[in-house]
Every structure is written in C-alpha cells, then in structure tokens.
A protein has these predicted regions:
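Conserved metal-binding segment of the jelly-roll/cupin
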Residues: 5, 24-46, 54-56, 165-168, ...
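A short hydrophobic beta-strand segment most commonly corresponding to one strand
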Residues: 46-65, 213, 228-246
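Short amphipathic alpha-helical linker/capping segments at the junctions of internal repeats
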Residues: 20-31, 58-62, 69-78, 200-213, ...
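Short, surface-exposed secondary-structure edge patches
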Residues: 1, 22-23, 162, 182, ...
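A short, N-terminal "cap"/entry segment at the start of jelly-roll beta-barrel domains
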Residues: 79-166, 172, 248, 262-283
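Glycine- and acidic-residue-biased ligand/ion/polar-headgroup-sensing regions
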Residues: 1-17, 167-170, 176-197
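Short loop/beta submotifs within extracellular cysteine-rich repeat domains
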Residues: 9-12, 18-19, 40, 48, ...
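Short coil/turn segments at secondary-structure boundaries
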Residues: 14-17, 45, 65-67, 175-178, ...
Length: 283
C-alpha cells in the first residue's frame, strides 16, 4: 500500500488478465498493488513527490523486486528480438542493469493512453481517496480515517489508517487480534505504550518521522504529548480491520465479575464508561 503525501502518478502495468490502470494521486490518496503485479510511480510537476509505502511482510524489501530495465538488460538480444518481433539492433544501447530512478521530461497533465490493454474494472481500482472521505470516526480528542477491503476491495492484505490526535488526547488502550500494527508519525510527538503477557510493559516517545511496531495481540495506546495536533499513519498486515478496546472489554463484563476481579465495590465499577471510548480527550 502507498500513501501519497505529495502529488504523484501511479500506473498499474498489468494484471494477470492484461488489464491496466493509470491514476493521479493527491495528498491523502492511497494505492494498493497486489503482490507480484507490475507498476510504476512518476513525479508530477516541478516539485518532488513524497509517498510512504507499507508492505504486509516485515521481511520484504523494496529492493527485492525487479524492474523492466533489469530484465530486458540481462536477456539476450536474440531472445528479445524473437519475443517482440523486432530486429536485434532495436535493443542496442538499452541499459545493462536496473534503472531504479529514471529522470525524464515532466509527464503531461492529461493521463496518456497505453500502448494497448483493457482498463481495470472500477470495482478493482487501485486508488482510494481516503482523506477526501469523511472520517470513519470523529471524537472530542481527534478523528480517524480507515480503509480496509470492505471499502477498498483490492486491498486484501493491508488496512490503512490515518489518526489525528489533539494535544493531550489518547487513542485508548486496545489490541488487534488479527494483525500486527506499524506506525509512522507524519507530524507531532506521541507516547506509545505496549503491554504483553507476564507483566511486560514499555513506553516509547515517537516524533515526526519515527516509526513504531506493535506485534499482533499486544495491548497498546497512543497519546499526543506535544503542544500541537499529531497525525499518525498506521498500517495493518490484514485486509480486515479488527480492534478490541479496553473500555469496550470492561463495559462488556457483568458488574459483579469486575468487582470480584478487582476486589472493588460495585459502586465504583458502575461509574466506568458503558460504551467504547476509542479516543479520550485531554483532561
């Protein structure tokens, strides 16, 4: 999954059925390319583009892929000539190794036509305008945009979230039963806690440009400890979003069970929230 920070253009070169798609992306738009599908990214205009990539496997590297230049550069000219029905001389001067970044003319504003190939069906588009949509949830202390395969069908292995927190606000203690969580602080200063079995508890401060990681099933929270609003990009290695919040867990238990577990009077238990908090505002 890619998250556009500055304007860019992405071309999905080929599905197994030969369908193609080219889209322009504005800040807040996202794309998803299934594993093994060809694609290319271009900068539009005179300013640099900026995007953040999320992979569903922490062992994967961007450098673990191969490019069209690398493949053609290593294939014999005789083989290429037969493949494309061209003379061998047509491949004189082609790069002999991978061209990772290629500098060319600024792409035209209008998306050009492909050499051939049917367009991808709208239901399988690789583009989703996340920040152009209304937030998934709005709270006193912040808001959240979320997209998974229920809204973006092609994104079968990754869920994307953008979380805004006001100063002092807390994304409450919670855990994800089906996925690991990767965090990138786009802006702000946040405190992230993590809790595991056998009393393991840790707190880390993350600042703009820092990344964090929470293993599947570990309890955690995110709190804005700065003086300005914070924005966090969050990725999950599952196409279905699942979360269990601590307030919801408490609210779902009988009062007498909680009172017994905590050895506290039922009168105290009854003042706990009886619904999901999700984001708690600053006191």
């Amino acid at each position: 999954m890619g998250v556009c920070v500055e304007r860019t253009r992405a071309h999905h070169g080929d599905q197994p059925a030969g369908r193609t798609e080219t889209n322009d992306f504005e800040p807040g738009d996202i794309w998803y390319f299934p594993r093994g599908h060809a694609h290319v990214l271009e900068c539009l205009g005179n300013e640099p583009t900026h995007f953040i990539l999320i992979f569903d496997n922490g062992y994967f590297s961007e450098f673990g892929t191969f490019s069209i230049t690398d493949w053609i550069g290593h294939a014999p000219k005789s083989l290429l000539a037969k493949n494309f029905g061209l003379p061998e001389s047509a491949f004189d001067g082609f790069p002999k190794q991978e061209v990772y970044f290629a500098r060319g003319a600024i792409p035209p504003e209008q998306i050009p036509e492909n050499l051939q190939g049917p367009r991808i069906a709208p239901s399988q588009t690789h583009k989703f305008r996340m920040l152009s949509e209304a937030p998934h949830g709005v709270f006193k202390g912040g808001r959240e945009w979320r997209v998974d395969s229920t809204r973006f069908p092609i994104s079968t292995t990754v869920t994307g979230v953008i979380l805004d927190l006001e100063p002092g606000a807390l994304r409450e203690l919670h855990w994800h039963p089906n996925a690991d969580e990767w965090q990138y602080v786009i802006e702000g200063d946040v405190s992230v806690t993590m809790f595991g079995s056998h009393g393991r508890f840790r707190t880390e401060l993350l600042h703009t440009g820092d990344a964090g990681y929470i293993p599947q099933g570990y309890g955690h929270s995110i709190e804005n400890v700065g003086s300005k609003s914070s924005r966090i990009l969050i990725g999950f290695n599952s196409g279905i979003y699942q979360s269990i919040d601590l307030s919801s867990w408490v609210a779902g238990n009988p009062v007498d069970v909680l009172a017994t577990n905590f050895n506290k009077p039922e009168s105290l238990i009854r003042v706990f929230p009886r619904k999901d908090v999700f984001i708690a505002p600053s006191k």
